[in-house]
A protein has these predicted regions:
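Flavin-dependent oxidoreductase catalytic core characteristic
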Residues: 1-164
Length: 164
């Protein structure tokens, strides 16, 4: 949410954008939940039950401008990677493994959601958001790739190396 606001914040009054609500809720959630780990625990159920993937697929059905279509195509591939590692983690049926990769999974979901919001805004107001959409999608794609590779290559047997 903070990354999304940084991009939108430069264009003026942020109450006009969907990410304003996400930013506001993220700040409140931090106060009430206490720690990022508790937020991870709360969010991971929606990652593993397919809610975030379904939301991302719904966002894909929202038309975007011709200029934003190449970004949308890249974003669809990012969602494919998110779904692939989410499904692989669920299929492993290892709670410790899920706990270990949970934050990476929800970070993948988060950057995909924020990318969709930017593409939607860039479609409506390209003069304000087109460049930001390109910049943020480059960042988000790198983050998804990083987490995708880590989760895909990680073996449950390696968990021992991460314990105290």
């Amino acid at each position: 949410a903070y990354d999304c606001i940084q991009i939108h914040g430069g264009s003026g009054f942020m109450l006009e954008y969907a990410c304003q609500r996400i930013y506001r809720d993220a700040r409140i959630t931090s106060i009430y939940e206490g720690t990022t780990q508790l937020q991870t625990v709360a969010a991971i159920r929606y990652v593993t039950n397919g809610s975030y993937a379904a939301t991302l697929r719904d966002y894909e059905t929202i038309p975007c401008s011709e200029e934003m279509q190449p970004l949308m195509d890249r974003l669809k591939e990012m969602t494919n990677k998110f779904e692939a590692v989410t499904n692989a983690t669920k299929e492993a049926a290892n709670q410790e493994l899920l706990d270990f990769v949970a934050r990476r999974l929800y970070e993948m979901a988060a950057v995909c959601v924020m990318s969709h919001l930017l593409i939607q805004d860039a479609t409506k107001a390209p003069e304000l958001f087109a460049k930001s959409a390109v910049v943020y999608l480059n960042y988000a794609e790198a983050e998804v790739e990083k987490h995708f590779n880590f989760i895909r290559k990680f073996k449950a047997e390696e968990l021992e190396s991460y314990r105290k």
